[in-house]
Amino acid sequence: MPSIRAIHWCFTLNFSGKIPEIVWTADVQYSIWQHERVNHDHLQGYIQMKKQTTLKKMKELLPGAHLEMARAPKKAIDYCQKKETAIDGPWEYGTWISTGSHKRKLMERFDEDPEEMKLEDPGLYRRCLSRVQMTKVREKNSWDYDLRPWQDELLKTIEQEPDDRTILWVYGPHGGEGKSVFAKYLTLKEGWWYTAGGKATDMLYSYSLDPTCHVCIDIPRCTKEEYINYAVIEQIKNRIIINTKYEPCTIRDDGHNVHVIVFANYLPDVTRISEDRIKIIYC
């Protein structure tokens, strides 16, 4: 499955002798840690990043530490301040932000009176409705089939860290190979975005609402080859998204590479995109 990404992390850093000095980068929103001793000395800590960060990046930030996603941040913070095994600390860096509180309030408003929200702010209503529908679909869908060889190859590829250049192109000319079904399955997972293509402005506006996601572009058979938006594909992969619809803005997300997968019934047009960017997976 895709690389582990998270904002909230727990860490344990074993040491002997002098307490290791921890120097945080600007990517860290908040951290709390303390010196503990059970069978050995270690630092027990919690980190809140400013954006979703891969396990690989976290290991570079804190070499030698054991790291896990923190699924309950408040409990993790409390755990890093427990008295029973504490020797020194706790120490803090930055300011903790209660993530998701704004989303929770919006969803509470939606749950209480969706019709009122629909009248007051139709756009917000549609986004909340979409979130509710996606949650329902995620709860009742699973992959209960044997993987085809190309699906297995694709999964193994996206288990690796994405680079800043490679675009995955899943090619099946005949139809019925399972491309669309698999694209929809992948994008049921958190951190993935699905589109069937369309106008560049519409695609970029939609993606700009959640611009840290991996991407599946599922091209319908009826779409003519010349209408594929290679510029959109490259913008997303290059991490510079220029949205000109409604509220024009440029979103830069340098260094946060994402997987971009195109599912199509034809091969890429290498006169419109660099051939060395494309990794073709044949169905």
UniProtKB/Swiss-Prot annotation:
Chain residues that bind ATP: 172-180
Organism classification: Viruses, Viruses incertae sedis, Alphasatellitidae, Nanoalphasatellitinae, Milvetsatellite
Role noted for this protein: Initiates and terminates the replication only of its own subviral DNA molecule. The closed circular ssDNA genome is first converted to a superhelical dsDNA. Rep binds a specific hairpin at the genome origin of replication. Introduces an endonucleolytic nick within the intergenic region of the genome, thereby initiating the rolling circle replication (RCR). Following cleavage, binds covalently to the 5'-phosphate of DNA as a tyrosyl ester. The cleavage gives rise to a free 3'-OH that serves as a primer for the cellular DNA polymerase.
Entry GO terms, CC: host cell nucleus
Renumbered ranges of motif RCR-2: 42-44
Other information: The genome of nanoviruses is composed of six to eight segments. In addition, some isolates contain subviral DNAs.
Cofactor(s) the protein requires to work: Mg(2+); Mn(2+)
GO terms, molecular function: ATP binding; ATP hydrolysis activity; DNA binding; endonuclease activity; metal ion binding; nucleotidyltransferase activity; RNA binding; RNA helicase activity
Chain span(s) of sequence motif RCR-1: 10-13
Details of cofactor binding: Divalent metal cations, possibly Mg(2+) or Mn(2+).
Residue sites binding a divalent metal cation per the record: 36, 42, 84
Protein name: Para-Rep C10
First-listed, main subcellular location of the protein, grouped into a coarse class: host cell
Active site (catalytic residues): 79
Keyword Methyltransferase found: no
Species for this entry: Milk vetch dwarf C10 alphasatellite (MVDC10A)
